[in-house]
């Protein structure tokens, strides 16, 4: 099963990949992950961006597949010559917008997934022999993350270094507040963020606040309200309604590493609150 990048936010990309890895278990296929040029968190070497953040899941690459001329491929828009294409009839046309259940019981030797898939959609199709059969979606996501998401050691070292310097020995609350382009997805985003602030207000006054936000405006609000209790990493943020992954930075891998650092630091904190409609918060909460 060739799992291509979905081409959206970092943890949206990871969530899609986890769903496809679950699909590979259901269909007994060998997963090959390739986050190509359409991945927003790619650098300029045109390789597999997944390996910039996590340990590789297979020694087989997309180029190895391209050299096997006896492959039969589903959907049939793909050939061994165009496996690296990133926008091949993705939204319209033959083989576009395929959901995970359409990959079940396919006879082809290679199946290619290039459109967003979700764990929830696949849960009813888990066979009784699967260890996650009958489990909640959150349990399945935890199972998949523990099995497949092994952060690179250099990223884990950065996490531990920051934690030891800024968070260790304190009662810590991780807070995720979205701004920028999220307001186009969530109409009442500001009121939801205000609910998060109300929750933080109710905590003990000595709690250190590890703030994850993509928006300078919300960072300023938290600093004005909570002062030195607010701890943040030095990462790219925006001061307008354009998401950081859409800024002309030139190196998407920097954003990806920053997202990894923030997320895994949040997992080290004693408690967490965030927006459940964000993939970042959903992954941390799971």
Tell me the role of every PLM-derived stretch:
Residues 1-206:
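Secretory-pathway glycan-assembly enzymes, especially type II membrane glycosyltransferases
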Residues 191, 232-269:
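Donor nucleotide-activated moiety binding/catalytic core segment of transferases
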Residues 4-9, 250-252, 270-271:
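A short glycine/serine-rich beta->alpha loop
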Residues 213-218:
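Short, polar loop motifs at secondary-structure junctions
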Residues 18, 257-286:
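A donor-sugar binding/catalytic signature common to diverse glycosyltransferases
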Residues 222-233:
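Conserved helicase motor "Helicase C" RecA-like lobe of SF1/SF2 P-loop NTPases
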Residues 205-209, 269-272:
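Short active-site oxyanion
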């Amino acid at each position: 099963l060739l799992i291509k990048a979905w081409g959206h936010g970092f943890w949206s990309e990871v969530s899609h990949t986890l769903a496809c890895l679950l699909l590979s278990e259901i269909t007994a296929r060998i997963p090959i992950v390739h986050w190509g040029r359409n991945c927003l968190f790619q650098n300029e070497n045109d390789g597999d961006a997944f390996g910039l953040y996590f340990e590789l899941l297979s020694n087989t690459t997309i180029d190895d597949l391209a050299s096997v001329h006896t492959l039969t491929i589903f959907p049939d828009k793909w050939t061994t010559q165009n496996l690296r294409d990133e926008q091949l009839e993705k939204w319209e046309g033959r083989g576009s917008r395929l959901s995970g259940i359409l990959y079940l019981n396919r006879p082809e030797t290679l199946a290619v997934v290039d459109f967003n898939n979700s764990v929830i959609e696949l849960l009813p199709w888990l066979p009784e022999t699967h260890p996650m059969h009958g489990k909640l979606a959150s349990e399945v996501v935890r199972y998949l993350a523990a099995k497949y998401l092994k952060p690179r050691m250099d990223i884990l070292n950065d996490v531990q270094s920051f934690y030891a310097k800024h968070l260790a020995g304190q009662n810590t609350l991780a807070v995720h507040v979205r701004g920028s382009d999220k307001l186009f997805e969530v109409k009442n985003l500001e009121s939801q963020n205000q609910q998060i602030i109300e929750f933080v207000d109710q905590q003990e006054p000595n709690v250190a606040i590890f703030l994850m936000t993509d928006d300078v405006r919300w960072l300023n609000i938290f600093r004005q309200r909570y002062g030195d209790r607010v701890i943040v990493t030095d990462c790219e943020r925006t001061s307008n309604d354009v998401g950081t992954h859409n800024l002309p930075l030139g190196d998407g891998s920097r954003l990806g590493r920053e997202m990894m650092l923030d997320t895994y630091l949040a997992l080290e904190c004693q408690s967490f609150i965030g927006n459940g409609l964000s993939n970042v918060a959903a992954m941390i909460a799971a």
